[in-house]
Structures are given as structure tokens and as C-alpha cells.
């Protein structure tokens, strides 16, 4: 059992989350310059410029389980890095809104596929004692990527004059190259090797790094016992409860409004009265708080469990979202608004942000884990795309005052709290093969 190797493999694969976070938020700095450059309508800007990457994530998450099972988790992760590299360079040299949208779509496919491959891989090379915090490293890297993207946008503002947005987008190619190189050095998932390649010997060598020597034979037997089910349909009726859990946690994740805030943070803060430079710097503070409270979540998830963090996060969501709506409706000071936005971000980071990828990667058995991860993440990205596409239009209808939108998100988080209290099971301290649910 080699804890250092397990951590190194996990943090390497979790770097896909860094590219995910960077790619997701880097567009916030380019949003307004692109709108002015190509003079796009609110609907076109929302559906194509801001949401095209999200439509790519829908495709990547829907079909990400196919390469995960066919060519393996590791090889899928390598191709994900290549997609990020192509998207970064292509977006930077885009010559019109259509070419820009195409390359953003390519990056979105990489993001969507990474939300399937990375948590699946990490859950399969970790043990029950550390699985929560190791899978949550993916989320840590997402928020670290978000923070670096905000900071990068702030530093590059004015760097290239009217084309500074091209530098903001193109710089992502550098970490993409390093990610590809690092992933080449991690082993294949032992569970994938047994189930899809029948290579028990190679899997055994990897399992020795994960479990004590005395448990290896037992683990191999448990994994093999699910081999005859690897072609099972996820919709066979055997996994209805897991499907419902994955759908609801992903649905509520996006109905918190998190992507709306992250994508439109500078615009939201400017509409509340902050100057452009101040709003970008405030976005950096959002990224920092996100990172800090994700670190708290990493420390707590295997100690107190997934449900506990979701309860704390839900309560924080409700208080902060209703307060943000109040700030907009009654035109309160923009710095008061920023405080409640930071509380919202902290609530997300310690709750949904830390838990979602861990929980979905745990609840499905070996035979359909990648497919289940794909279903949960596809739900996440479909709603992310829909919300991001329609919010520019809705804000325009509300005379650029999004207060009622935040009231709506607050109501949805009341429903999430009910889901956590009444339906969500605890998965802390249970091995993947021992995870049982009543459908």
C-alpha cells in the first residue's frame, strides 16, 4: 500500500479539473470585449458565445463513458488534454463569432468528458478511507483553475489592447501541454483492466499500491464478480435509485445558480455599481474564497460525510441567495452584495462543489460506473447550458436587475435541503464493491 503514489496519481488526473475550471471561467474576461467586437444580440451571445462550450460539455458528458470503457480511463484523459489544447489555440485566433463558437465547443467536449473520466478513475484507484478527499481533488483543481483564470484575466487586461481577450483564451494551451505529459505516466485503472481487458496480473500490481497485501485476493474476487454485468444497461431497472440520486444532485447543483455567477461575475458586479477594474478584482476574490472553502471541504468530507457537507451548503445557499436578491431589488451597496456573493461561493464550495463528483462516482457499481457518471454529469451540463443560454435574455427582460433570478435559485435550494434530509444516503467509509442501495 503506497499512499504517496495514490495521491500522485489522483492529483495528476485531477489536473483535468484545473483545465475545466480555467476553461469555464476564462470566458468571463472576454465576454464584454467580444460582445462589442462582433456586436452580437443578447440571444446570439447567450446561445453561441457564452453557451457553446456548455453544449460541448453536454456531448462530452453524454458520450464520455464510451471511450472510458473502450480505450480506458487513462487514454480518454490524454485525449481530453488534446481537446483543451486545440480549443485554447483555436479560440485565441478565431476570426468571427462562428469559428470562436466552434473552438469553444471543442473545449466543452473536453470539459464534459473530463467530468466522466477523472472522478471515475480516481474513485477506482483509491480506498474507502481516502476516496472522498482524493476524488474531491478534482473539484479542488476546478476551483484552482477558476481562481487562476480570474487572476490571469485581471493581469492580461490591457496587455494586448483590443485583442487582450485573445491572450486570455490562448494561454490555456500551456497547462494543457503539461497535463498531457503528466497523464502519460499514470497507470490504468485496475478495475478497468480486470473488467474490460481481463488483465488480472497487471491489475494486481496496481491494487498492491492501493490495499494491504492481505486484501488483494478479496478485492480481485469482488471486482470479477461484477464482470458478467459489464454490458448491463443502466436503464435495466436495477439502478433506478442511483439514477434518481445522480440526476437530483446534478440538477440542484446547477439550479443553485453557480455557473450563472461564475460566468457573469464581472457583469453582475458592474451592474451593481462596481467599476470594470474593481469588478474583475472582485472576481479574483470570488475565486480565492472558492478555493479556500473547497480546501475545508476536502478536510471534512471523509471525516463528517457527504450528507453533512450538503446540509451545511444548502443552508448557506438559501441565506446568501435570498440576500443577493434583496440587494438587487432594493439597490443596496455593491460591496454588501459582494459579501453575500462570497458567502454563496463559500456555501457552494464546501457543499455541492466538494460532494457532487465524489457522490456520483461512488453510487454506481463497477459494471455501470462510467455510464452512471456520464448520466449524472450530462444532467449537470444540460442544465448548465440552458441556464447560461437564457439568463442574458432574462436579465435583459428584467431591465438588467437579476434580483428575481436569485430569489428563484434560493427557492430551489430549499428543495435541495429537503432532498438531502429525506433521500440522500451517506457513502462515507464504504468500499465501492460494498456500496448497496435499494432501488
Locate the predicted segments by residue:
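Alpha-helical transmembrane bundle of multi-pass membrane proteins
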Residues: 1-199, 225-439
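Conserved H-loop
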Residues: 213, 217, 275
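Short, well-structured alpha-helical segments
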Residues: 216-225
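Solenoid-repeat scaffolds in large eukaryotic assemblies
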Residues: 202-206
Amino acid at each position: 500500500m503506497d499512499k504517496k503514489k495514490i495521491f500522485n496519481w489522483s492529483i495528476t488526473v485531477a489536473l483535468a479539473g484545473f483545465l475545466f475550471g480555467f476553461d469555464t471561467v476564462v470566458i468571463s474576461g472576454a465576454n464584454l470585449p467580444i460582445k462589442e467586437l462582433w456586436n452580437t444580440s443578447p440571444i446570439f451571445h447567450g446561445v453561441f458565445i457564452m453557451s457553446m462550450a456548455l453544449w460541448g460539455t453536454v456531448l462530452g458528458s453524454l458520450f464520455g463513458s464510451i471511450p472510458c470503457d473502450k480505450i480506458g480511463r487513462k487514454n480518454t484523459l490524454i485525449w481530453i488534454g488534446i481537446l483543451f489544447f486545440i480549443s485554447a489555440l483555436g479560440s485565441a485566433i478565431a476570426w468571427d463569432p462562428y469559428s470562436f463558437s466552434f473552438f469553444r465547443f471543442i473545449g466543452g467536449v473536453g470539459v464534459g468528458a473530463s467530468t466522466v473520466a477523472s472522478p471515475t478513475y480516481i474513485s477506482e484507484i483509491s480506498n474507502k478511507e481516502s476516496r472522498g478527499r482524493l476524488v474531491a481533488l478534482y473539484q479542488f483543481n476546478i476551483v484552482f483553475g477558476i481562481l487562476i483564470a480570474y487572476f490571469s484575466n485581471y493581469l492580461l487586461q490591457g496587455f494586448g489592447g483590443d485583442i487582450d481577450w485573445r491572450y486570455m483564451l490562448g494561454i490555456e494551451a500551456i497547462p494543457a501541454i503539461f497535463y498531457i505529459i503528466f497523464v502519460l505516466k499514470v497507470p490504468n485503472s485496475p478495475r478497468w483492466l480486470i473488467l474490460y481487458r481481463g488483465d488480472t496480473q497487471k491489475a494486481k500490481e496496481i491494487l498492491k499500491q492501493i490495499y494491504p497485501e492481505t486484501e488483494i485476493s478479496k478485492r480481485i474476487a469482488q471486482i470479477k464478480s461484477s464482470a458478467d454485468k459489464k454490458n448491463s444497461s443502466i436503464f435495466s431497472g436495477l439502478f433506478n435509485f442511483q439514477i434518481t440520486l445522480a440526476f437530483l444532485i446534478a440538477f440542484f447543483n446547477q439550479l443553485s445558480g453557480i455557473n450563472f455567477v461564475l460566468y457573469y461575475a464581472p457583469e453582475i458586479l458592474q451592474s451593481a455599481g462596481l467599476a470594470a477594474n474593481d469588478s474583475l478584482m472582485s472576481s479574483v476574490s470570488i475565486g480565492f474564497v472558492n478555493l479556500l472553502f473547497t480546501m475545508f471541504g476536502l478536510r471534512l468530507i471523509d471525516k463528517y460525510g457527504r450528507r453533512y457537507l450538503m446540509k451545511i451548503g444548502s443552508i448557506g445557499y438559501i441565506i446568501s441567495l435570498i440576500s443577493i436578491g434583496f440587494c438587487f431589488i432594493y439597490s443596496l451597496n455593491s460591496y454588501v452584495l459582494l459579501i453575500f456573493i462570497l458567502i454563496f461561493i463559500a456555501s457552494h464550495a464546501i457543499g455541492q462543489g466538494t460532494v457532487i463528483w465524489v457522490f456520483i462516482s461512488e453510487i454506481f457499481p463497477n459494471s455501470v460506473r462510467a455510464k452512471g457518471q456520464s448520466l449524472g454529469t450530462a444532467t449537470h451540463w444540460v442544465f448548465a447550458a440552458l441556464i447560461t443560454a437564457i439568463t442574458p435574455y432574462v436579465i435583459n427582460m428584467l431591465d438588467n436587475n437579476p434580483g428575481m433570478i436569485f430569489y428563484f435559485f434560493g427557492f430551489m435550494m430549499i428543495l435541495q435541503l429537503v432532498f438531502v434530509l429525506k433521500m440522500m444516503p451517506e457513502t462515507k467509509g464504504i468500499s465501492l464493491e460494498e456500496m448497496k442501495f435499494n432501488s
